[in-house]
């Protein structure tokens, strides 16, 4: 809820929206749906079959006053019931509101919050988390991707200086966290000794074995000028960041990402989203030209990998060396994009690509920014002026994208054909077989409007066979 004291001018990610998870919480064989909420309680819907869902949020004990962002599901205590881990962030400095939450499934449609007990109630500004077995010891460790609240995008030369001069408590919130599972119901923060201690603006994370050494690596998609991180697992509890030698370039305003094999060669590829419109008018009115001086400083003086403002799709050539082919595939420009999902929706054995997008305020509009600057010069820099200008900004919902993978590195925009035709401000997305018919359905979390639930009709039209594991 925007107010003069609390809006996109006070918190850069005010309009970023929330995630969604699909998980069977009561072991009845039907996948249920959990929605994280910004400025609104989380919601848990029980699947009653035939695409009918019951809201059990209040009785389940998963509603909260926190600003929830990403959501992950895991059976953290190995009792056979899926638990829910919620990342929190928002326009606040209150650690009680920032603390991530772990909802332990009691097996009776209720949950108990136990983040602090497990030692994973991270109080940074968290975007998403992923559970994975970092050290191949048979239990799941946890990587929590955080983002800095200190944005000096306009003056990148001073950002690190400003960050380092902040009090330790504030500075540490700019770093993501790696937790090692001790196997006894507790986790330890091993970020510094593992080699992951780097500040950033994490908005997307993907975990996979990119270099084929048998250990899971971590890719972090960073917003603004900080380059994406590609952490390669050394198999001894440490990681080496080495994106510079693995890709020719990356996205600039990196958002969501996903890892999957798009050409069925057995190697894991990587999609990363940015915010460049495909529409010529929006491209010219909303996007700045590349800043040559900034680009030169970041690449030549800082040594960052070159970053460009478009989606990237990196084809794995082996051992984690990638060729970027986003433009070649026609997936490079999808507007202000958020979630990327690489998954086979039409059961043809090729991974398709879903992209959610939309941003509530066109705050990158050149005319709007010029008018704001004029008002600042003539009336002074105040929150009241910014709030007034925000109310005058365009609010343009746009449609999401789905690209059909035809094989042989050919993607077609199938958005309209497959039913993605309603404009929205969409962020989090998840897939799962909600009706157990052998194809994957999609749930999308929208900002300030009802969610989208897409029923996949593939199996109504095909005679494919499938195997279901229960």
What are the residue ranges of the model-derived segments?
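Acidic, glycine/proline-rich Ca2+-coordinating loop motifs
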Residues: 1-470
């Amino acid at each position: 809820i925007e107010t003069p004291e609390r809006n996109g001018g006070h918190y850069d990610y005010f309009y970023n929206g929330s995630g969604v998870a699909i998980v069977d919480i009561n072991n009845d064989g039907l996948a249920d749906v959990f929605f994280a909420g910004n400025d609104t309680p989380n919601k848990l819907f029980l699947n009653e079959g035939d695409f009918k869902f019951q809201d059990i949020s209040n009785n389940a004990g998963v509603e909260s006053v926190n600003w929830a962002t990403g959501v992950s599901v895991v059976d953290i205590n190995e009792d056979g019931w899926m638990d829910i881990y919620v990342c929190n962030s928002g326009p606040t400095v209150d650690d009680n509101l920032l603390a991530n939450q772990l909802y332990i499934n009691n097996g009776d449609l209720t949950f108990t919050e136990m983040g602090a007990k497990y030692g994973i109630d991270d109080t940074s500004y968290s975007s998403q988390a992923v559970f994975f077995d970092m050290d191949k010891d048979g239990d799941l460790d946890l990587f929590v991707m955080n983002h800095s609240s200190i944005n000096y995008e306009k003056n990148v030369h001073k950002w690190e200086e400003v960050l380092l001069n902040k009090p330790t408590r504030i500075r540490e919130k700019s770093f993501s966290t790696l937790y090692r599972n001790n196997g006894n119901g507790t986790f330890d923060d091993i970020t510094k000794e593992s080699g992951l201690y780097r500040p950033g603006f994490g908005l997307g994370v993907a975990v996979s074995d990119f270099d084929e050494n048998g250990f899971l690596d971590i890719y972090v998609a960073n917003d603004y000028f900080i380059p994406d991180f590609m952490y390669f697992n050394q198999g001894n509890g440490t990681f080496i960041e080495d994106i510079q030698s693995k890709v020719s370039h990356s996205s600039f305003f990196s958002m969501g990402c996903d890892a999957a094999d798009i050409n069925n060669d057995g190697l894991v590829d990587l999609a990363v989203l940015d915010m460049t419109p495909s529409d010529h008018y929006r491209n010219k009115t909303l996007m700045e030209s590349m800043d040559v001086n900034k680009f030169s400083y970041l690449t030549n003086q800082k040594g960052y990998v070159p970053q460009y403002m478009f989606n990237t799709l990196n084809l794995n050539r082996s051992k984690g060396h990638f060729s970027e082919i986003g433009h070649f595939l026609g997936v490079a420009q999808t507007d202000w994009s958020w979630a990327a999902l690489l998954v086979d929706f039409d059961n043809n054995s090729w991974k398709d690509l879903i992209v959610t997008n939309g941003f509530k305020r066109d705050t990158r509009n050149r005319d709007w920014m010029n008018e704001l600057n004029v008002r600042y010069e003539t009336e002074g820099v105040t929150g009241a002026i910014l709030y007034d200008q925000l109310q005058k900004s365009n609010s343009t919902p746009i449609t999401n994208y789905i690209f059909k993978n035809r094989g042989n590195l050919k993607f077609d925009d199938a958005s309209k054909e497959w039913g993605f035709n309603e404009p929205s401000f969409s962020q989090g997305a998840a897939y799962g077989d909600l009706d157990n018919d052998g194809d994957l359905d999609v749930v999308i979390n929208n900002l300030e409007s009802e969610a989208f639930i897409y029923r996949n009709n593939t199996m109504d039209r095909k005679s494919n066979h499938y195997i279901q594991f229960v």
